[in-house]
Amino acid sequence: FHDIPTTVKRACYVASELGVWMLNVHAMGGNDMLSAAKEGVDQSNQNPYLIGVTVLTSMNNDNLNEIGINHSMNKQILKLALNVSTHKLDGIVCGASDIKGMKPSLPKDFIYVTPGIRLLSNANNDQKRIISPEDAIKAGSSILVVGRPITESKNPALTAEEILKKIS
């Protein structure tokens, strides 16, 4: 979610009550929004993982500059990750290649959800920061997000099996 704090708090509460196992909020929503998200989840009788989205893997440094962020991608991701950690969220969404530089600064049990996973045979599509499944695991990814490589495959089940073999 990415909205005003009151709306995010309610959305996180309702999503939690519906039984989701994980939900995410955009870390650039700010301190009040992150606190509200955590409150919404904590008020629920459920206990989903609450994850903060740092910088989308479809973005690069040029895209950050376009929206007024004039420091490096790595600095922005670390800044957001530290803020997510301060607000006691369970982890972040980031590119797998972003993990190594910030892992020592974050909690040991922090969850790293990583999109932009591609097989060598896959197109990048709109992803700018991609990585193979096996390299994502080596980099420290906790949860891989694999969408189009499977959903747009001629044989989705076979592709999913291929990915699982690569990370086993």
Language-model features and meaning:
Residues D98-M102, Q127-D135:
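Short glycine-rich, acidic/polar surface loops and turns
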Residues P115-R129, A139, V146:
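Catalytic-face loop-and-helix region of soluble metabolic enzyme cores
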Residues L34-G40, I137, I150-S168:
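C-terminal helical cap(s) of enzyme catalytic domains, especially alpha/beta-barrels
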Residues D3-G91, G95-I99, S105-D109, L119-N122:
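Conserved anion-binding
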Residues L23, V84, M102, A136, ...:
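Conserved, mostly hydrophobic/aromatic
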Residues F1-H2, L144:
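Active-site cofactor/substrate anionic-group-binding motifs, chiefly glycine-
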Residues V93, L144-V146:
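Short hydrophobic alpha-helical runs that function as membrane-insertion/retention elements
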